[in-house]
Structures are given as C-alpha cells and as structure tokens.
Amino acid sequence: RFKKIRRLGALPGLTSKRPRSGIDLKNQLRSGKRSQYRIRLEEKQKLRFHYGLTERQLLKYVHIAGKAKGSTGQVLLQLLEMRLDNILFRLGMASTIPGARQLVNHRHILVNGRIVDIPSYRCKPRDIITTKDKERSKVLIQNYIASSPHEELPNHLTIDPLQYKGLVNQIIDSKWIGLKIN
C-alpha cells in the first residue's frame, strides 16, 4: 500500500496515511519528461487502487460508461462513486474502502432492509443503508464513526449517526468526487 501511495500520491480510499512531503531521491531520478502513456497509466492505477478494483472490473465500468449518455469520464466516476463500499466510506461508516468492503462481505450492512454482501452493489437514489441490529455490527460502525475525521459530507448523502443509518439522496455531482483524476 505504501509503495502505491508514494508512487501515485494520496489515495484517501486506500489508506488514511499520506506520502511524506519533501523530495525523495527516487523522485529526482524519475523526474524526466512524463510521456502520455505514463500519465494515462498512473491515472488508471489511481482509479484502480483508490476504489479497490481489478483490471477486469475497471474495464467493465469503462464499457458501461462508454455506452451511457454524457462524458465517459464523468459517468465512470459517478458509477464508481455509487458503489456500496464507496458510499460507506463517504458516510464515515468505514475508515477506508477496503474496510468498507470487509463490512459488506461480513454481512453487517443492510440496503433497504435486506442484507447485501456484494461491495460493488450499485446504490440508487433513495436507498437507505443501515447496520444489522446485532450489537457487534453497531459497535463496529460506532467505532468507525467516532474515530473518523468529520469531513464535509457530500450533497448526495445524509447520515443519522445515532441510528447508524445513511441515505442516498441523488446521484453524485461531479464536484463532490473525492479523487482528482487528470
């Protein structure tokens, strides 16, 4: 993980740690002219590592975004931001996207009253995301909410921290996307 964030810069979904500031010797050695190929590859890798996708999953999302109306890049980012694991991360119910994936895989999360154990589940507007009624699930989420830095919540989400409930209001607006992609 740390090699990835050193190479690609801060990836808030992958880890809460930041690359050290200052000039590395390695960065000086590779500071030559960046080719278009290298820029595109680094941006693709940022997407993959931030959202925790495999190459095949990313290709599938690019294919879906290409068929949709609008800018392919914007539609792609909207699709990725509306994944269940990412929404849990944005709500503050998990400290990282891999942590959110684990919550979903271990069946702690309900969407509209039904257990969902697929992290790539695509949330829709008016979806209600809650925790299981088990004490263990609530304690996990409570610890994440208490320990997470209270960042500004995107417009498309609302959270009720007392009931451990989140609501998807609408599809995300492009200015609220957390990752800066070139």
UniProtKB/Swiss-Prot annotation:
Residues 82-143 form the S4 RNA-binding domain. Part of the 30S ribosomal subunit. Contacts protein S5. The interaction surface between S4 and S5 is involved in control of translational fidelity. NCBIfam families: PRK05327.1, rpsD_bact. InterPro entries: Ribosomal_uS4 (IPR022801), Ribosomal_uS4_bac-type (IPR005709), Ribosomal_uS4_CS (IPR018079), Ribosomal_uS4_N (IPR001912), S4_RNA-bd (IPR002942), S4_RNA-bd_sf (IPR036986). Belongs to the universal ribosomal protein uS4 family. It comes from the Eukaryota. One of the primary rRNA binding proteins, it binds directly to 16S rRNA where it nucleates assembly of the body of the 30S subunit. GO terms for molecular function: rRNA binding; structural constituent of ribosome. SUPFAM superfamilies: Alpha-L RNA-binding motif. One of its GO terms (cellular component) is chloroplast. Keywords: Chloroplast, Plastid, Ribonucleoprotein, Ribosomal protein, RNA-binding, rRNA-binding. It is found in: Plastid, Chloroplast. One of its GO terms (biological process) is ribosomal small subunit biogenesis. This is Small ribosomal subunit protein uS4c. It comes from Tigridia sp. (strain Lejeune 1997). The keyword Ribonucleoprotein applies.
